[in-house]
Amino acid sequence: MTLHRKYGSDERIIIHCETVTKVAKILADAMLKEGKEVDVKAVLAGAMLHDIGRSRVHSVRHGLEGANIVEGEGVEMKVVEIVRKHVGAGISREEARALQLPDLDYIPATLEEMIVCFSDKMVDADRVRPFEAEVHRFTVKGHDVSRLVALKRRLQQELGEDPEKVIFDKVKETQ
């Protein structure tokens, strides 16, 4: 929260990041219960900071800007990578070049990166929503829906069940 305040993040962005953090914690805890090794602290920090780059820019570059901010603040590289790779369902090296981003691979690869990226896709503003709503948004915007579906599938393989169901079951428990 200190970094969000320092860099002037809008209150809506902070609330969104808090909601994504709650969703990411649900998934990280479920992974731990399945015996998966997951750095929960990195997941929570990455989820809370994933949109800090929006304090500078509201484009596809916000992931890169956010990564630069948190790296400059001395945040652990694992968290820097989570912030950098959360945009869309990831951005390939070729897409990055076309978007005039640094020539890097922005596709979530670690369990922590995938958890935060997926959690972000499950949250619209401060509301958890069905995965199909994000599929629809990706389709309308012309984004790579297959990469989004693959992200969910990868998490499902790790978790042994549908991550969307895990999230909604837990959300229902807390209501």
PLM regions: where:
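His-Asp-centered metal-binding catalytic motifs of divalent-metal-dependent phosphohydrolases/nucleases
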Residues: 20, 38-73, 80-90
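Divalent metal-dependent phosphate-bond-processing catalytic cores, especially two-metal-ion Mg2+/Mn2+ enzymes
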Residues: 6-36, 49, 75, 95-175
